[in-house]
């Protein structure tokens, strides 16, 4: 058998092994992709409706359409989750006129962090994040409410004077990934809201919302900064905007107890 044939067989075998390994990883990672929805639909909502007790959630607001759940990862991380099935950022429901403003609701829910911490937390130390369709493990929309990474806060502060009320690339990106940023006011956070600002103002975003991760943090001025990154096979970026967060909350003066 010629060396070229052996080499081709070797490459083919290697390719098959890579595909099988990728499939196994995908299966293990996403086999429990409905875990959050099961907690909300089978525990939090029933307990709230029958016993007026949101457990294991911290809050269930059925009229407003959301629940807040303490995440197991990190002492202060919470998740805001819709009380109706919504897969994620790619869902067209988020861009309808009647959709709740989940980002605004998540920002209001940040008080759970301070309550758990036992002291006020500066808004500039807090961040919200939703991962792209390719950078998440759950198929129920959830917004991470957690601390901002110290190095991210420092990097953003270096450019704070340049942030405008329109999308612009962030020079140098963050954590090795490309990001676009937009300054938004408190009014814009409420209306039209982050999902609409991304879909309506970022060229081409409305047709491929699932490829975007989206995050928000407060600026010292009282405005907010919206950050978006886009999944890319070329740069191996899954657009997990959660990467901007630090669930151990090193940014706080005193580290919280798990």
From Swiss-Prot:
Quote the EC number. 3.6.1.26
- Localization per record: Cell inner membrane
Which Pfam families does the protein's record reference? CDH
Q: Belongs to which family?
A: Belongs to the Cdh family.
Q: In which pathway does it act?
A: Phospholipid metabolism; CDP-diacylglycerol degradation; phosphatidate from CDP-diacylglycerol: step 1/1
Its recorded reaction(s) are: a CDP-1,2-diacyl-sn-glycerol + H2O = a 1,2-diacyl-sn-glycero-3-phosphate + CMP + 2 H(+)
Please provide the record's keywords in A-Z order.
Cell inner membrane, Cell membrane, Hydrolase, Lipid biosynthesis, Lipid metabolism, Membrane, Phospholipid biosynthesis, Phospholipid metabolism, Transmembrane, Transmembrane helix
Annotated source species: Yersinia pestis
What are the BP-aspect GO terms? CDP-diacylglycerol catabolic process; phospholipid biosynthetic process
Recorded GO terms, molecular function?
Answer: CDP-diacylglycerol diphosphatase activity
Main site of residence? membrane
The name of this protein is CDP-diacylglycerol pyrophosphatase
Q: Which domain of life is it from?
A: Bacteria
Task: Output a single Gene Ontology CC term carried by this record.
Answer: plasma membrane
* SUPFAM superfamilies noted in UniProt: HIT-like
Q: Which NCBIfam families match?
A: PRK05471.1-3, PRK05471.1-5
Membrane topology is: Single-pass membrane protein
Q: Which Gene3D superfamilies match?
A: HIT family - CDH-like
